[in-house]
Amino acid sequence: MVQLTANSSGAAGDISVREWICWEGEAPIEPTSTLVLTAPSNTFVDTRLLLPHPFTPTAELPLPNTGGPLHRLDWAFSGVSETLPPTVMPQTQHVAAAHAHAPPLVPVDYSRLCDFSATGPGGSSGGTVSVPRKRWNHLIDSKCVAPGQEPAPDEGDMYAVAGRPEACLEIGRMEREKGSGFVLRYQEMWLSVQARLVGSETRRQGVVLSLDMPERRARGVIIRVAQFCQALLIANGQIDLERWEYLVAAPGNPPEWHRVAKLGSRFLPCAWTFEGGDAMGEEVAVGSTLQDGEMGWQVQERFAW
């Protein structure tokens, strides 16, 4: 999600976490645990789970992991991202325009965005700035579970951050509350997480499973990228979500896959994507369908790097 270039043609997946969000007129905060997994095809799954706050009952876990409560879900969605044509203008004009309505909250690395040898529109000098712009097309959206509901546009400008090559600042506009019609500017700081090897695997592994059953009003996705796996299923208005991570749960123990978050009563077949899982065998071809009871999941993509 934080890639600054055109859609990747390589085999690497991307792991991103959000450091903070800032709505126009407010201070930056991070009320959620937000994790985005993106495959080389730009298929992604983005889950945002509310963290405990001072008024959260003490019995609640840092992340919901027993099926609820559903109010701990801020937002979860999945689809395909695309790179839009960048905004190109003279550097001085862009800086002035950007600071007129939404000055970046962190220093921007214009050296990664500027071509100082280029001539701007109308023959202006001083170099041009080209700001990448991305759109995330939602095919599954926890805020659109009722028939006829459509996801709101989701796109933003992606700025390189000075001194932080792993970071990207997204600036855009969207409704804070769906259906309110009140659009606000926002800024989000995204960080890329290093992908790690898992178990005895010699390459970082990834896979995308998808489910589309209109007769059940069901759509779902499972994406594994290296040491993370996330699943999202919406069926007949019911939301099910899982997040897994390959980690050391306690000192002295070997690393294992652990479920770190779960919402909903259905158990999703994330284990198919783990080492030796049903979706990871060499004999399993892209396009194959794996059955989980009455639910058929198609192997949409496999990748390793």
Feature-to-residue mapping (PLM):
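Beta-propeller blade signature
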Residues: 76-82
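Lipid interaction determinants
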Residues: 1-76, 88-305
